[in-house]
Amino acid sequence: SEDGENPNVDDLEVGVFPVHYDDLKLELAWTIVPFMLIVYLTYISWAPLDNIWSSPNGGSFGDECDYFNNESSDLYFDEDDGLKGAYKANCYHTIEITAKQWVWSFDCGTLEAELCESGFTEADGRAVPHLSLQAGNAYLAYMTSEDVTHAPWFVSLGVKEDVLPGQTTTVWILAEDVEDFLLLCTEYCGDDHAYMMAGVTIHA
């Protein structure tokens, strides 16, 4: 106004909520719709998450394979398990993965070379550790770190799990398809973090 006073164009009253700006239907919609979406996403992810975090004692992948009888995992996909199906195996093999700045090391234990073999390969013009596994088998990797926190990411398999100094963590490696891919560290672990990689081969 001309005398410098601002008129109360919205007819607001001190201490009174402006009800004419309220929209109950809209508020219910933006509360209920995201809630239902979260419930749906939880439902469709439950089976694969339960599968990849399966117990090593009689879970989806049975018990540890009998090495003396050269037992195979016989990994297969059960379409009738859960909404989207799940991987299962008669048994599994165990391996060990150790991380330290800035290299991975693999221990196949008593497994035959056909089931698991470690060595070196070339990636980005450098010699890097290499792990070779046999397709059609399930592996349970026991992992630890000798120094700082690392996070091995099996790129093609889409699995990742942190490894911590002084602790042992596990991850299931389901070797289904014949392929080659990288194992990368996805937790910053120092100056050469970007070069901490290994080659992984799944062979027939």
Model feature map: region roles:
Residues 2-204:
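Non-transmembrane, membrane-proximal soluble domains of secreted or membrane proteins
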